[in-house]
Amino acid sequence: MTQISPTRLHSPLDRLLVEAQRALDTVFGNPPAERPNPAADTPDVVLDPEQRLHAAGLMRINHVGEVCAQGLYFGQAAVARDAHTRHHLLEAAQEETDHLAWCADRLHELDSRPSLFNPVWYAGSYALGALAGLRGDDWSLGFVVETERQVEAHLDEHLETLPQSDQRSRAILRVMKIDEARHADQAEQAGARPLPAPIPSAMALASKLMKTVAYRL
């Protein structure tokens, strides 16, 4: 990726180029993880065709979740008013990049692919993140908390429904769940505002739609 000098990041064009590069890397690239894959030392097993398709569908949902998280965090960081909030968001986004890479690796192992709608998921999440950020950093952090809590819930569901023998996927999801819980706790400590009741419900409905589509496509 082309590096842009920090002294030039005040230019609107430079900021636009950075955001465009982040979007391309997330949606079409394969950003490398900074941490080792949690499944690296877990033996793989041969799943039957039905188990493999189910595991791939769940891991595709998780991959989409990480694409959405990247879009949300980058959208929020782009309009964050406080440098500490921006740093918090970008730091969380880096850990989500690890998750993105691990899920992509597992999809490849399962002879599957990411969602065809990743550009749509990213664009929608980026717009939501930017809108939340424009309301203020406390709102932005509130969206982080709610997003991570909902992700934790669906990771628990996936850990319950994955084929019992698919320990490689389980190893990845367990570490992801720990990270998501920490992101939510850190956002709360940083001053997150609790979101009004209709917003979490709308987010859950959108998440349900995403999961239904991403499981197959």
From Swiss-Prot:
It comes from Xanthomonas axonopodis pv. citri (strain 306). Keywords: Cell membrane, Iron, Membrane, Metal-binding, Monooxygenase, Oxidoreductase, Ubiquinone biosynthesis. One of its GO terms (molecular function) is 3-demethoxyubiquinol 3-hydroxylase activity. Catalyzes the hydroxylation of 2-nonaprenyl-3-methyl-6-methoxy-1,4-benzoquinol during ubiquinone biosynthesis. Fe cation 1 binds at E66, E96, H99, E180. Gene3D superfamilies: 1.20.1260.10. This is 3-demethoxyubiquinol 3-hydroxylase. It is a peripheral membrane protein. It catalyses: a 5-methoxy-2-methyl-3-(all-trans-polyprenyl)benzene-1,4-diol + AH2 + O2 = a 3-demethylubiquinol + A + H2O.
